[in-house]
Amino acid sequence: MAAPANASSKKDHVIPVLLNECSIDSPSFRASMYYLGNQIKAFNEWSHDFLCCCNKFIESIMAIEPIVASMSLNAMPSNVASGFFDPDYATTALLHGQDLFRSSYMVQLQQAKNLRKFIVAPLDLFRDSKVKPLLQLNDRFKAEQAKYDAEVLRYSSLGHSKDLSQMRDEAKSLYEARKSYFTVALQYVVRVTSFRSSIDFIVIESICKFSIETFRLTDRLHESNRHINDQLIRLLSYETKLKESYPSLKRIVSNVFDRIEKEILKRVQPPTNLDAYRFDPQQICQTNATKRQGWLLRNISSSKADNKAIWRKYWFFVDNGYVGYLINDANGGVFESEKIGVLLCKFSVLPSNHRKFCFQIKTKSVSYILQAETHMEMLEWGSVINNAREHCINSGISANRILSPTLPSFSAKATSIINPQVNGRSNSTGKIGKNYRPRRTYSGRLLCGPNNYEVSTIMRSPTISTVPPPKYLSNSINGAKFLNPLAPWTLVNAPLITNLTHETITSLLDQEAFFHGNSPCALLANFWGSVNYGHVLERQNVYIEDLSNPSYKRLAREIHIEKLPSELKLRNAEFRGIFGESEASTVLFVCRVCSKREDQIRMPGRMYCTMKGIYIYYNINGLVLIEHFPISSILNVKQFASTKCDYFYMNIQNIGTVRFRLYLDSSKALTDRLNVLLCNYIADKPNSSIQLLSCIKRLNDDVKRFERGGDDNALKSYGVQPSQEDLLIRRGRSSRALTNLINKNESNDSFMEDLRDFKIAMLPKETVQVVRSHHLDDIVFDRVYNVSTKALFHIVFGDRSTVLSGAYNLHGVDDVEFLPWGKDPKTNLSRRYINYKVYNYDQEGQCQSYHYEDCQIMDVRNDYHLYIMTWLHHSWTLPYRDYFKIVTKTSISHLRREKSRLLISVGLEWIVKPFAISKVIEAECRKLAIKYIKTEVNFLEKATRRARNQPLIAIINQYGRVGDYNESMVYRRKIPFNCELKNLSIIDIIRNNWWLFLQGLAIDLLKLPWAVFHIFLRYLFSHSFLVIIFACSVILNLSLMFCFGAKYWDERQNNKFVGQVFDEFKNIETSARYVYMKDVDDLLVGLPTYLHPNVTYPSECLQSFALKSSPQKSHWLRKRNYIAEKRKKILENLASLNYYEYIIHEDAVYQYIQQELLGCDKAREFDLYPPSMQRYCDSCTQDWRNRTLFFGKDTLATRLLTLETVENADYAA
C-alpha cells in the first residue's frame, strides 16, 4: 500500500502483512479471494456429501453399520479444515463426534431421528441460508473485479489528446466502477467473518447437542467414550458463552467496517480540479518518505511501438533500500521479483503521446517502463526513490546490489511442493497417483498461496519435515494411550498469524495511515492472511554474551530447536510466526484459554509459556489481541475446577488478578508447570529450557503413575502423541500460590522432591548453622529479621539495592561504578569490582580526584540456606591507605520459616604492615566499618518491614536479581558534594588511641632482634633521653601558644561543646524538624506546616489569624517572604560547609538568626498575633533560640534539608 507523504516510520510495523501490502485491491487480497472461493466450493461439496450420507443412514436402517463407519471415517479436507474450523474447539468437537457416531449408533439404531433433528436439518438449513448466498456473492465479486480491471485499463489507455473535461468524465466512470467493486468487496468481508463464526457455532452446537442427547437416551454406550461426555459439556458451555458475546462483537466489527467503507470512498474519490489531470514535468513532490508500495502499469513489450505495447498491473514496492514487485499467479499465489538496490536505480520521467504519467526505473541490466494513475503519484514514486537513495548513503546502508529472493523479507520461501494435488483434490494418503503431473517449480521466486502455507509455517524450524495431515493426526491421537495434558497436536496445519490488533483497525482511520490512491485499506488480507498468508520476519542473529556464569536473561534467550520434540518444534515455529524473532524464546508448553473482555466479549486464544514470560494470542471474528506478561511480574497463580470449565487465576504485579477459563486443558497441570517456571526464575542457579522440559516431563509422568497406580512400563517418551483420555487429569481444587509453594514443605512432597532433583532448591526444614571459620574474629553485628534468607539476600545485595551505593555516598563518593559479576579463575568464585572516585582539596585550594577499586566476592550462595559475601574496601580517609584493605564478611542464614539471621564481621587485610601503628589503624578501621554497618542496618530495618507482606518475586523485582546485569552500573550524587574530606593524620589517630599504640609498639618491639631491642632499652632509660623529651615538650608548648594563643583553646572548647550538642540531636529530632519547617515564618504567612502541642485550638486560631487583614500585616508578609528566601539560601550554603568552616562563620550565622528573632518580636508591636496565639509564639521563639547551633555541621545541615522525605531521611543523610 502506498505510504502518504507524512507517514511516520513508527506505523510501518503496525500492519506487517506483506510489507504492509494489505489493501482490498492488492495481490494478497486477490489471492485470498481466489483461495476463499475454492474453500467455499469445497465446503459446499463436502457438506452435500455429508448430508447425503446422513439421509442414506436414516433411510437404510438395515445398512446402518457400514454407513456409520463411512461417516465417522470421512475426514475433513485439509483446505476446508484449515480455512474455517477452529483448530482447538471446533475440530476437537468434530473428532469426538466422529468417535461417537461409530460407537453410539452401534448400540442404539433408534438415534436416526435424533441425527435428522440435530445434524441434518441444521446443516441443510445452513447450506440454504449461508453457503449458497455466499457463493452467489463470490460470483458477483468476480464479475465486479473483471469489470473494474477492464475499466482501469481503458482509462489508462487515454492519451494526452483527450479533452480535459472528457478525462474528468472518464475518471468519474472509473470511480463508479471502483466504488461498486469496493462495496462488493467489503460486503464480502463482512459475510466471510460471520460465515466462519456461523460454521463454528453450527458444528459445535449440532454435534454437542446430539452427543448429549445420545448419553441421555442410552446406558449402553461404549465404555471408552465416557470421558468424552465431560469435555463435550465443556465445549457446549464454551459455545454458549461465545454465542452470548457474539452480538456485542458483531456490533463492534460492523461499526469498524462502516467507518472504513466511508473513509475508503471518501479518500479514493477523484479530484474535481482540472489541474490535477495536467502533466507538468517541472512540478516537485514534497515528501520525506523512504517507503512506498502500490499498483503500477508495466510495459512488458518495450520493443513494440507505443500504440501496440502490452501493459500489465504489478504491485511495486520500495522498502529498506530495495525496489521490487509482486504479481499474482493464475493459481492464486503471490510471487516476488528479485530486489534491486536503489543505489543502482535511476528514475526518469518519460513523455509519451499515447500514455500519460509514464516514468522509467533503469539499471545496467534491467529497465522498468511504468505508468502511474495520477501525476502526483508519479512524482511521489520519484521522490521516494531519491529519498531512499539519500537515506542509504547517509546511513551507510550497502543497498547497492541485486538480491536473490532466497532470503525473503516478507513472504514464505518455496523450497518444495507440499501436498501434491491429484485431479483437483488433496491426496490424503501421501501417495502420488498415476495421472499426477508435477507442477512447475519457480526457481528464484517466492510463493505465497494455498499450496504453500505449510512451508510458511515450518520454514523457521529447519528440523521440522512437515505437518502431518489431519487423518494421520486423528489416527495418532486415537492410537496413543497417554497424553500430555497441554498442547496436543493441532488438528490442522498450524497457521502463521500476523499482528492484527485493535490498534491496527484504529490506525486505518488515521490521517497518516496507508490510505492513498488506489490502495484504500488493510482488512481482509490481514484477516484471511492470519490463516494461510503472513508476514515472515527475517531471522535475526541474537547475540548471547559469553559469560562463565550464565544469567537468567541469557538462558531465556537460548533456543535449542533441534533438541525439542516434534510437537514443541511446531509450537515454537507458530510462536515465532506470531510474535516475531524479537521475542525469541523457547516455548515450553502451550495451553488453550478463554479470556473475558469488555461488553461480555469472550476471547479464545492460546497461551505460549516461555522462560521470558507468558504470551497470549486471541483471535475471533477477524479481531486479534496479543498480551504479554513477563515472568517477573507474575506474583502467584492458582486454579480450581468445575463441571463446565476450569478456572485459572494469575496475580500480576501492578495489574491485579487476570482470570481465564480452560475448556480443553487442565488448570491443575497448567498451575504446576507455571510454578516450575516461577521457582526457576527466583532460583540462584536457574536451569535452561531443556532442563525445565525434563522437570515438566517428570511432573507429568508422576501424575500419570498416580492415576494408573504406578505403571512405569507404560510410559512413553515426551514427543509421543498422547490420547484424549488423559486430557482431564485430576481437577481437584488447588490453593498453591508461589509463596506457599516455596515455603510450605508439608503439601505436595513429591512435587518438591522433583524440584530438588532438577536443582530448583526449596526451603530447608532445619536451621542452617554458620561455621565459625566462615567469619572473621571480630563479629560486630548479629540480628534476626522476619523475612526469608533469599528475600534478605536480594534486599542487601540485589543489583538495584542501594545499600552499598548509599554507604559510598555517605562518605563523600561522587561516582561509583559497579562492574559486572564474573568468575575468579583462581578461586572459581563469583566476584565483581567496584570503581569509585573521590575529590579532595590540597593546601593550595586545588581540587584533586583520587580513584580507588574495591572488590566484592560471593563465597557461598546456597538457595534458601546460606549466603556469604566478602567486601574488600579501601579507606581513603586514613593514613597508609595503600597498606591495607577493610574486610567485611556478611552471612545470611536460614533460621526458620520466614526468619533469617544476619551476621557481619570486620577485619583488616594487610598488604604491608607498618611498624608500631597497626593496632591504632585497626581500631580506626573498625570504627569506619561500624559506620557503614549502621547505614546498612537503618536501611534494612525499613526495607524488611516493607517486605514482610510482599511475595518473593515482588522483592526480587524491586531490588533486582544478583548478578543479572551485563553492563556496568554507575551511580552519581544528585547533590554536589564540594566539601573537603576530613583526612585523619597519624598523630590524631595515635593521640586518640595512645594505649593501643603502646600495645602495638610493644608487640612490634618484641619481634625485633634481641641486640637491637637491648640498645633501644638502654637509650630509653638514659639521662639524655629524658632531657630530649623535656626539651621537645617545652618547644611544643611555646610554638602552640605563639601560633594559636588563647583563640586556639577557645575554638577547641567550642568544638567540644558543639560535639555534645550534636550527640543530643537524635533525642530532640522533633524540635529540630519544626524548627527547620519554619513554623514562625509559615505562621506569619498563614500556612503553618507543624502544630505545636501548646496550641489548644489550632484550627480556630489559624482561621482567625488568616481572616485578619490590615496594611501592617500585608507589609509584614512581604518582608517575611523576602527574609524566608534569604534564609533558604543560607541554609543551602550551610549544607556545603564542613566543621572548620562553620567555626569561622559561626558568629555571622548566629547574628543573622538573632536578627530574625528580633523581627519576630516586632511582630507583636504591630499587633499581628491574636491573644490565643501568644503562648504558641513564645514557645516557638524559645525553642528557636535553643536550637541555633544545629545548623553548624555539614551532615546535620544535609539531614535538615532532607527531613521532608518520608522513609529514607536517615539513609539519605
UniProtKB/Swiss-Prot annotation:
GO terms for biological process, alphabetical: endoplasmic reticulum-plasma membrane tethering
Pfam families the record matches: BAR_3 (PF16746), PH (PF00169), VASt (PF16016)
Membrane topology term: Multi-pass membrane protein
Any one GO molecular-function label of the UniProt entry: lipid binding
Compartments where located: Cytoplasm; Nucleus membrane; Cytoplasm, Cytoskeleton, Microtubule organizing center, Spindle pole body
Annotated CDD domains: BAR_SIP3_fungi (cd07609), PH_SIP3 (cd13280)
Residues annotated as domain VASt: 776-945
Transmembrane segments: 996-1016, 1025-1045
Residue ranges occupied by any PH domain in the UniProt entry: 289-390
Keyword Ubl conjugation applies: no
Keywords: Cytoplasm, Cytoskeleton, Membrane, Nucleus, Transmembrane, Transmembrane helix
Coiled coil regions, renumbered to chain: none
Designated name of the protein: Uncharacterized PH domain-containing protein C19A8.02
Annotated source species: Schizosaccharomyces pombe (strain 972 / ATCC 24843)
